[in-house]
């Protein structure tokens, strides 16, 4: 049995809770802020110690490149253990006009070259998040959400959906007679959508997250 110091156990438990809550491991800055470290460098030291003990794996160059190891009931996380040799070129989608496809050319502001190790599976585009409705899932205003195009999603997955003229990011929960779009922030209301509603269309699922300034 691997023995961790009290501080290392705190860091490990924080990583696990973050992955259970959102699917994303925390950044060094988030670990430092949560546990009261003086800087992200202090968090990095503890992460390296955990990696040496074989309980996590770190992906070089990825701010969220942390993977839990050797745990039978480890939560599913939206990251990969190793960087691939090739880079992905992903379009960044800004504001989406009503009634037009998300990937319409006029919505694409630029392209990013991304390390595939940042994502659980290959995304099709990055969507700039607006608002704080998913704050408690670690998704903040201005973040770039990596999205894989899908027309179906599993219960509990974080999705991108078109709702009337708007595009929204929420957690999907299936309910009798429809689905509920769950906000991860008590300041925002959940949205119930009746089965077969013409106002609702699933656009994709979240497969990763990039925070500007950490990219």
From Swiss-Prot:
EC number: 3.4.21.88
Homology family: Belongs to the peptidase S24 family.
DNA-binding region, residues: 28-48
Catalytic machinery residues: 133, 170
Positions of the record's site feature: Cleavage: 98-99
NCBIfam families, alphabetized: lexA
One GO MF term attached to the UniProt entry: DNA binding
GO biological process: DNA repair; DNA replication; negative regulation of DNA-templated transcription; proteolysis; SOS response
Lineage, top ranks: Bacteria, Pseudomonadati, Pseudomonadota, Betaproteobacteria, Burkholderiales
A Pfam family assignment: Peptidase_S24
Organism for this UniProt entry: Burkholderia mallei (strain ATCC 23344)
PANTHER family attached to this UniProt entry: LEXA REPRESSOR (PTHR33516), LEXA REPRESSOR-RELATED (PTHR33516:SF2)
Stored CDD domains: S24_LexA-like (cd06529)
UniProt-recorded name of the protein: LexA repressor
Keyword terms of this UniProt record: Autocatalytic cleavage, DNA damage, DNA repair, DNA replication, DNA-binding, Hydrolase, Repressor, SOS response, Transcription, Transcription regulation
Superkingdom in the source lineage: Bacteria
Reactions mediated catalytically: Hydrolysis of Ala-|-Gly bond in repressor LexA
Assembly, per entry: Homodimer.
Role: Represses a number of genes involved in the response to DNA damage (SOS response), including recA and lexA. In the presence of single-stranded DNA, RecA interacts with LexA causing an autocatalytic cleavage which disrupts the DNA-binding part of LexA, leading to derepression of the SOS regulon and eventually DNA repair.
């Amino acid at each position: 049995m691997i023995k961790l110091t009290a501080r290392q156990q705190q860091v490990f438990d924080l990583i696990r809770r973050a992955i259970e809550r959102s699917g994303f491991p925390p950044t060094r800055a988030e670990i430092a802020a949560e546990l009261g470290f003086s800087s992200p460098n202090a968090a990095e030291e503890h992460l390296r110690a955990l990696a040496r003990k074989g309980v996590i794996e770190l992906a070089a160059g990825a701010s969220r490149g942390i993977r839990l190891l050797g745990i039978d009931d480890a939560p599913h996380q939206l990251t990969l253990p190793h960087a691939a040799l090739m880079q992905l070129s992903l379009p960044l989608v800004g504001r989406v006009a009503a009634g037009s496809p998300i990937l319409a050319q006029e919505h694409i502001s630029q392209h990013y070259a991304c390390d595939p190790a940042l994502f659980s599976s290959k995304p099709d585009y990055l969507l700039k998040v607006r608002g704080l409705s998913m704050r408690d899932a670690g998704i903040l205003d201005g973040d770039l959400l990596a999205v894989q195009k899908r027309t179906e999603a599993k219960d509990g997955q974080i999705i991108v959906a078109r709702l009337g003229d708007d595009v929204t990011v929420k957690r999907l929960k299936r309910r009798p007679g429809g689905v509920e779009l769950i906000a991860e922030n008590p300041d925002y209301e959940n949205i119930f959508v009746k089965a077969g509603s013409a106002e609702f269309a699933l656009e994709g699922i979240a497969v990763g997250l990039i925070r500007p300034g950490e990219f």
